[in-house]
Amino acid sequence: MTPKRMNREHFPHWPAGLPHTLTTPQTTLVANLDISAIRYPEKTALIFFGQQITYRGLKAEVDLLAGYLQQCGVRRGDRVLLQMQNSPQFVIAFYAILRADAIVVPVNPMLLTDELRHTVEDSGAEIALSSQELLPQISPLLGETDLRRIVVACYSDYLSEMDADAPSWVCAPRQPLHDDRLTAWSDAIAQGLSPTTALAGQDDLACMPYTSGTTGRPKGCMHTHSAVMYNAMSGAMWAGAGSPDHIVLLSLPLFHVTGMQISMNTAIYAGATLIIMPRWDRDLAGRLITKHKVTSWTSIPTMMIDFLSNPNLAEYDITSLKRVSGGGAAMPAAIAQKLLDMTGLRYMEGYGLSETIATSHSNPVQRLKQQCLGIPIFGVDSRVIDPETHRELPANEIGEIIIHGPQVMVGYWRDEQKTREAFIELDGKKFFRSGDLGYRDDEGFFFFTDRLKRMINASGYKVWPAEVEAMMYKHSEIQECCIIATQDDYRGETVKAVVVKKPGSNISGESLMEWARTQMAAYKVPRVVSFVDELPKSATGKVMWRQLQEAERAL
């Protein structure tokens, strides 16, 4: 049989000593916690302000909660909703759902009732684990959907008495529950129940994150234990992040695949220590890095921009950091250089989607390129195609990025049509269509151009907002920038820059446009500039360009 073709231009830049593919254990994700609890029982697994939980303690609480879920009727293959801020309870709940042989449905805590309704109804979840401040959003769905019980967490249950850093909403005391369909987390644990023998295997579904709904209603991405395990292992091995000596700062939300995989699941696979931030706060991040000697931090560019622009930054000792990585958008060159000047560290960029349960591409540590997605990681074959003809494109031509690999989802939950549309066959392989435009260079490194549907058409010229944003960040007085389209009577569409100035800046829109004319082709130059105090961001810290674009079109 002729072997299936795979692009190999990037192999000369592969991380030294690592294989091109991984063989995952034939176990579920829960086995990672079990093994770390055996190997490092008294090692600290989680730190939440002043509270520490060992691997032995973490496994014990996971088993207790799993036993309670099974008593509530949770069975193999059931979907269980998980909606909380970053907290020890999120980690415990995630693994408890898996230990009960069920499927985790992680949900953005910012969603309101009508938004939650779709996820609950579509997934068919009957049980949810949430937190008391989110009850007003989720509890109305009891009785209106299949949802019949909510286990309610109180973050302050996991605080010690020495938690001066904890924000007031985390310190809020436990509130009484006046509905017999609600169970306090502490009561569920106190029942002392043990789970039955595990039945789920590596091919069972483990996690079903919902897409952000940028092209219609959110869709559940079905991922098996094997796929989630593969990427947890990949994260641990790729850049030497798999040492049990690592201290990992968790700043990304756990409901999102990057925080879930690259921070939580990779740390537990490795037996590392996870420092939990409930929400992003640049001063808290500085204090936690200083206090706990954090070695590994995965963030996104907006967090890093905010962190490095902090006037109090000099008060913190961040020299313990050994690895800083992230994705979600290209890191502006000026910010990457500032990080390098301050720490000697190069920001390691990567790429992935909900459909790939986080990483599919990453920069090799010894060959980092800036504003670059990196190379396909272990076992991944990635190509660039013409989105209309599906013809594979050569190096340096822009097209749609497609991905084949062990971490690619099985498909969308209960949506065969969208699943068919999401995949394409090439050389006998099934590739996922990312919807992202980009190209690969002569060395096999991939670069992001923009979302397929975000392009601005200015008098027939194609303008990619992400490219213009990267150039705008070179200006010393721009803190943040988002490029959108605005209507133009002559050009049809033209380029608009929505800008957040750095503190103390007096730059005008006209001077900014004059500067831009010296930096880029005339058709890319913003013809309209508006200044705002802040850009709208999602719970994961990404700039919500669609919100700005829709508001512009409504004018």
Predicted regions and their residues:
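Conserved AMP-binding A3 loop
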Residues: 54-56, 206-230
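Conserved pre-ATP/AMP-binding loop-to-beta segment of ANL
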Residues: 175-210, 217, 241-247
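Conserved AMP-binding/adenylate-forming
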Residues: 47-55, 61, 66-114, 121, ...
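Conserved AMP-binding/adenylation subdomain of ANL enzymes
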Residues: 229-247, 255-296, 304, 310
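Structural core segment of the AMP-binding/adenylate-forming
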Residues: 71-72, 99-187, 503-505
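Gly/Ser/Thr-rich phosphate-binding loop
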Residues: 291-299, 308-369, 381
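AMP-binding/adenylate-forming catalytic core of the ANL superfamily
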Residues: 111, 128-130, 297, 405, ...
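Conserved ATP/PPi-binding loop(s) of AMP-dependent carboxylate-activating enzymes
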Residues: 375-379, 391-423, 463
